From Swiss-Prot:
It holds the Pfam family BRCT. This is Ankyrin repeat-containing protein F37A4.4. It comes from Caenorhabditis elegans. The keyword Repeat applies. ANK repeats lie at residues 856-885. It comes from the Eukaryota. InterPro entries: Ankyrin_repeat-containing, Ankyrin_rpt, Ankyrin_rpt-contain_sf, BRCT_dom, BRCT_dom_sf, WSN. Residues 929-1025 form the BRCT domain.
Length: 1163
């Protein structure tokens, strides 16, 4: 028996021992994560303690990172000192308690009822009942037509049939042929219909104005009913008598209190609370990566004595010295526990009470602003007396039959009013959609249709979808006309009038009396609201006070913790310098803590993903319709591409995670250097790009259509499956484990001592080795320099200078508009203007675009030659300035030397002779252009237009915060715009289009999406350029032409153009002015005098046009200028002018003797 018991005991001990190290239910990878987290926490504690000893710790940043709040907002919060605010609030609350102590729920209810009745009084005061009594629908309806026709019924029928056919309604083949053939013949009827629109719109306005007055009659009727139902004629005087004493007690609080700004102070405090609570910090941990959870810091003390740490790190050696060194950190951890608790209380209570708290500042502001100079008692007595006098003529009786008759007739007239408004809205929408030029294009295309496959031909017409929208809109007209005619017949026999009801009630005399005796219901309203606010403050104060107390407690614990850490830096530093603290022995402890902590966070994401592997695999089994929806309609290109065949990538992800789990089992049993291989294996897992959050958003918009698939995408949308983005963190973590092992081995005396033996070496060998080392070092230095950013750029520039193509230069010249400007001025033009050879030489050597033009179309070489700056001329020629470039006078730079300078410029004779010799000297020589500097990403100023996806925009601005702005600025380099799937910018907004003519680089919104996936693509803006713009239904492909022209500052497109506006209203005046002036034109502030311009002159780049541009809206008579015999005027509508700009067609005046535009223009 004893033998059996011994055998059984031995078996139990063995079983328990063999399973002691395994945590049931946890994966091997999870257990490695838990164990390495011990090392991560200890390392982070050492790093923070070392920073405290060396006085480099940024304790506020450490705490805010632990709390996961924004450091700036939190610091602003702690700087808040609301002591004065609390004092005012306590004082006000005390007075409010005294004032409302005798009040009850009935008083609060009566206050609400008084406010409602006071609103009716205000309506009676302001209403003109004499006028309302004269309104009669039969009189108005005599002026309204029985029918409302604008288009021929045959045209509406054609459009209805086209709409049905295009939407897929089946027709016989012969009928369908007739339907589409009829499109070719409807042009005349369509334009006839459209021509009637101005008169039709005017008629609608004439109908709608008097008819809408009937709606006001209903409001008047509702007021009369309310006056009767509330019985205010008797109730108001009685209530004023009954509650005068408690009212005056409450109102007295305002009289005995100085006017303050309590509401504004509280609003500022709550705004800071809200910013701090609701704005999260960056998810990337830098100082506390070892403590991802709130309780992790307190675990460090136990980590040092844990079995795993003793076995894998200290390997049985005493940890007492390290425990002693980290005692101050443990005190910090204890103090932080109180901070966490205070923060959680503050955050949770504020989130619960935020809606209520948001209403209190306004309530307090109204109390602060209350008028204390009114004699309340006298006012209430006068109010009651005036009310009784005026309402003695009022009869509180409403005839039931009259009311029923009114409501019946109102329903009939109301249908007519709504019918007219519906037609008016339809006409307004059609007018907005209609574009004459685009319609001409559609009808031209329709006339080309042939009988065979006519529907397919129609569908291929460019932008036919826009035409179809107009057709669909017209199909609504028939039903709108029918509704109108039906409503007219019903209402035409219905007399709508309030004359008898108003007369019977005596409202005319009552309202006149109220107006004459100045009842002043608005002042009573302010008093009633003040009383309401005081009573409400008594209810809300406890919530407000609790939140303020939470804040004070949080601030107290924060300051105590910061003071504790500052104490460590003063006392501990002296002790550490004498004893040699072990926490100071490791180099870059903070870096290792950062790398190891963030590497483990990446492992944690893999663990979470591994738990969801079944759900991940289900995503490969979506039905065909859902897959097609993603491939064809997801707004993000890379997701469409990925979902063409997502299965292999997703299955490989799951397979890689399972392999990592399998290898973790063997790693756990080995030493630290073997365990770290989990990071190396993890870094090889690529994963998949972020797709599920975007797909989930796509499915969410479809309602229940993809409910089964959405359960999967919802579950996966929170997972980070793009493990390739964590490769750097995992690799860094692996290297940090190596360094940490060396540190701990040295700390615990585990490093083996190496014996050193001396050997004699030949001096010749030593010399040869030294020479070889020097040569190797020189070669390595040259090669190594090439791996630095400066070296790489310099080597690339050398290559481009000797072997580069024009296209290579063009890629960099795209940024010349921004690279070559200082304080908004081009550095070349400015250097010549200032005669600054030093700055000019610096600019050309760093590759500034050398043929840039000033606003007069002259290059720097033209200006330098014209002014006789021979040293500047030589610098420009020797650095590749184009000597054949023609300015707007069709002169080369050399031709800018005055012909008779010996007579006209005697003081510059030597200068011009020197310049002539320079041109002769280098006439047959060509010079290379210097390589333009690469425009750094850090100098990007990116502005994102409002129509882009809000989620993508917010993520992008967060990720690239330093180079993005939510404000448009003169320094903006890139403008991200919403484009179609074809990459076309569609907009009629000149405030957005102005960026094209400003010279900013216009990029598609898909750039943001791809940059979020791979931030290196921020440098590849050239792959996302917008090349086409659709304005007023027409597509133009000159966007990049404008960018390049502005980058190189070519001859201004509108040089010699003088613009005058002939419009009653120009909503885009500021944008048009900026475009015109930016392109070298002149915006005139008054109508031009033709005599000030030379006959026969033209803008330099538009010899086919007159120099005076008149922009008009088509309303004025401009035939005199249109038929000008001298062809000095060119007339444009705003759209035609933009068409000129977008086409960017140039007709250069090649005449060697250009006629100046202005009579007094200088050469």
């Amino acid at each position: 028996m004893k033998l059996c018991h011994a055998i059984f005991s031995t078996f139990v001990v063995f079983f328990v021992a063999s399973g002691a190290g395994e945590k049931q239910g946890e994966s091997q990878l999870q257990q490695i994560y838990d164990e390495l987290s011990i090392l991560s926490r200890v390392t982070n504690a050492i790093a923070l303690q070392a920073a405290a000893l060396s006085k480099t710790v940024k304790i506020r940043e450490v705490i805010t990172e632990l709390l996961k709040v924004d450091n700036g907002n939190f610091s602003n919060l702690l700087s808040l000192d609301p002591a004065h605010l609390v004092k005012n609030l306590d004082e006000l609350h005390k007075k409010s308690l005294q004032a409302v102590s005798g009040s009850n729920e009935q008083l609060q209810q009566d206050l609400k009822e008084m406010i409602a009745m006071n609103g009716l009084l205000a309506a009676v005061e302001s209403e003109n009942y004499t006028e309302k009594a004269t309104v009669n629908s039969l009189i108005v309806l005599k002026k309204v037509d029985e029918k409302m026709e604008i288009c021929d019924e045959s045209l509406i029928t054609i459009m209805f049939n086209i709409s049905q056919a295009m939407s897929g309604v089946p027709f016989a083949e012969s009928d369908e042929m007739k339907i589409f053939s009829s499109m070719k013949t409807m042009k005349k009827a369509f334009y006839k219909c459209i021509s009637k629109f101005p008169a039709f719109m005017q008629k609608l306005y004439e109908y709608n104005y008097p008819l809408s007055g009937f709606l006001e009659l209903n409001d008047t009727m509702n007021t009369i009913k309310a006056l009767n139902e509330l019985d205010i004629a008797n109730k108001i005087p009685n209530m004023l008598q009954k509650f005068k004493t408690p009212f005056l007690n409450i109102l007295a609080v305002g009289d005995h209190r100085n006017k303050g700004n309590t509401g504004k102070l509280l609003q500022s405090a709550i705004t800071l609370f809200k910013k701090t609570v609701y704005s999260n910090s960056s998810t990337r941990l830098f100082l506390t990566a070892g403590f991802p959870e709130s309780g992790d810091m307190k675990r460090v003390a136990k980590d040092l004595t844990s079995d795993w740490f003793k076995k894998k790190v200290s390997r049985g050696k005493s940890t007492a010295e390290l425990e002693t060194a980290l005692k101050p950190f443990n005190q910090f951890a204890e103090s932080m526990a109180h901070v966490f608790k205070s923060w959680n209380n503050f955050r949770d209570d504020f989130q619960t009470d935020s809606a209520l708290l948001a209403t209190i500042p306004d309530l307090l502001s109204q109390i602060d602003d209350y008028d204390r100079n009114v004699d309340k008692k006298k006012f209430l007595e006068n109010f009651e007396a005036t009310f009784r006098t005026c309402f003695k003529n009022y009869k509180n009786a409403l005839d039931q039959g009259e009311e029923t008759k009114f409501l019946k007739n109102f329903s009939a007239v109301y249908l007519l009013v709504r019918s007219v408004q519906a037609v008016e809205q339809w006409a307004s929408e059609i007018s907005t959609m209609f574009d004459e030029k685009a319609m001409d294009v559609y009808f031209e295309e329709l006339e080309k249709l042939t009988p065979s496959n006519i529907k397919e031909q129609v569908e291929k017409i460019t932008n036919f979808d826009d035409f179809l929208k107009i057709i669909n809109k017209f199909t609504m007209l028939k039903s709108l006309q029918t509704q109108y005619e039906s409503a007219y017949k019903t209402s035409n026999s219905s007399e709508l009038s309030l004359s008898k009801i108003i007369t019977d009630a005596g409202l005319v005399d009552t309202s006149k009396c109220l107006e004459k005796d100045k009842l002043d219901s608005s002042k009573l309203l302010k008093m009633l609201q003040f009383m309401q606010h005081m009573m409400q403050l008594d209810i809300d104060y406890s919530t407000l006070k609790a939140n303020l107390d939470n804040f004070f407690e949080l601030k107290k614990k924060m300051l105590e913790t910061e003071k504790l850490v500052k104490g460590f830096t003063s006392r501990s530093a002296r002790a550490a310098s004498n004893s040699g603290s072990p926490v100071l022995k490791i180099k870059d402890s903070q870096k290792h803590a950062d790398h190891l902590g963030n590497g483990l966070l990446a492992i944690k994401k893999m663990i979470i993903s591994l738990k969801e592997k079944a759900t991940i695999l289900k995503s490969t089994m979506f039905n065909a319709k859902a897959n097609q929806e993603i491939r064809e309609k997801n707004p993000i290109d890379y997701i469409k591409e990925f979902w063409t065949n997502p299965g292999p990538s997703i299955e490989k992800l799951v397979s890689d995670l399972e392999k990592l789990e399998q290898s973790s089992k063997s790693y756990r049993k080995a030493d630290l250097l073997t365990i770290r291989k989990v990071f190396e294996d993890g870094s090889k897992i690529v994963g998949i790009p972020e797709v599920f959050s975007y797909i989930d958003s796509q499915f969410e918009k479809k309602g229940s259509q993809y409910s089964n698939e959405r359960k999967i995408t919802q579950a996966l949308s929170t997972l980070d499956l793009n493990f390739a983005s964590h490769k750097g963190a995992l690799s860094a973590a692996s290297l940090s484990v190596d360094n940490l092992k060396l540190y701990f081995d040295d700390l615990f005396g585990l490093t083996p001592k190496v014996s050193v033996q001396s050997e004699s070496t030949s001096p010749i060998v030593v010399v040869l080795i030294c020479v070889a080392i020097v040569l190797v070092l020189v070669i390595l230095a040259i090669v190594g320099y090439g791996f630095t950013s400066n070296g790489r750029n310099q080597y690339i520039n050398l290559y481009l200078y000797y072997f580069g193509k024009t296209s290579d230069y063009e890629k960099r010249w795209r940024y010349s508009l921004f690279m070559d400007r200082v304080d908004g001025k081009n550095v070349l033009i400015d250097s010549v203007r200032e005669i600054n050879a030093t700055n000019l030489l610096k600019a050309v050597k760093r590759g500034a675009y050398i043929n840039v033009c000033n606003k007069y179309g002259n290059t720097a070489l033209h200006v330098a030659t014209r002014r006789g700056y021979q040293n500047l001329v030589e610098i420009l020629i020797k650095h590749g300035a184009d000597r054949s470039f023609l300015n707007p006078q069709n002169k080369t730079a050399e031709q800018m030397i005055p012909v008779n300078y010996q007579e006209t410029h005697k003081e510059k004779i030597e200068r011009f002779k020197s310049i002539e010799s320079i041109y002769n000297k280098y006439r047959k020589k060509k010079f290379k252009l210097c390589v333009p500097e690469k425009f750094p990403v850090s100098s990007f100023h990116i502005y994102i237009e409002d129509r882009t996806d809000d989620n993508v925009t917010n993520e992008f601005t967060t990720k690239f915060q330093s180079i993005t702005s939510d404000e448009a600025m003169i320094t903006t380099t890139h403008v991200v715009v919403k484009t179609t799937e074809d990459g076309i910018l569609e907009t009629d907004d000149l405030n957005l289009l102005i960026w094209i003519f400003h010279g900013s680089i216009i990029v598609r919104d898909t750039w943001m999406v791809d940059c979020l996936r791979d931030e290196k693509l921020i440098e590849k803006d050239c792959d996302y350029l917008v090349e086409k713009v659709k304005y007023k239904g027409i597509i133009y492909d000159t966007v990049t032409q404008w960018s390049n022209a502005m980058a190189k500052a070519t001859t201004p497109f509108l040089y010699g153009v003088h613009v005058a506006l002939c419009m009653k209203n120009c909503p885009y005046l500021a944008s048009l002015t900026a475009i015109i002036q930016g392109q070298g034109g002149t915006m005139l502030d008054k109508f031009p005098d033709k005599d000030a311009f030379n006959k026969g002159s033209h803008p330099y780049l538009h010899k086919n046009l007159g120099p005076i541009f008149l922009l008009h809206d088509g309303t004025g008579d401009l035939d005199l200028y249109r038929s000008d015999p001298d062809k000095m005027f060119t007339l444009f509508t705003e759209q035609q002018f933009m068409d000129l700009l977008f086409k960017r067609e140039i007709n250069k005046d090649t005449n060697p003797k250009i006629i100046p535009v202005l009579v007094d223009e200088e050469d």
